[in-house]
Amino acid sequence: DAANAYNAGLPPDADPYFATIQHLRVSSHVLIARDGSLTQYVPFHERAWHAGRSYWRGRDECNDFSVGIELEGTDEEPYDDRQYETLARLILALQQTYPMLADGWIAGHSDIAPGRKTDPGPAFDWRRLERDLRANGARFRREVLA
């Protein structure tokens, strides 16, 4: 189940695959479900384990300085309108609450760990997110390294 996957809560005896990954330290600050609902797992001021070995804009270990937002879905399946709406509201709130995020830099896991992570994938509409954010006064800056 998607909620448990991002909270390091998959029971190893529920599926043989879960047993093979039980040693991984995986978590996320939030998960935005297909219906747009948001579940927070880790407080924003604490470290979540979503990025793994990563590099972005001159810094290693993105878990140390980033917010991990997961979207339920696959790389190829278009995300739901409600997910984009929730994501834009969340980013705006984060930029207003945390001055270090107000510069507007936003990256996907595929940007910070290319070759190892693929999300949010080609189905994610970055232009739509930018429009939604700018329409509500949020900043949006993106640098694709791949």
Task: List each model region and its residues.
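Basic/polar, cationic surfaces and motifs that engage anionic cell-wall
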Residues: 60, 75-146
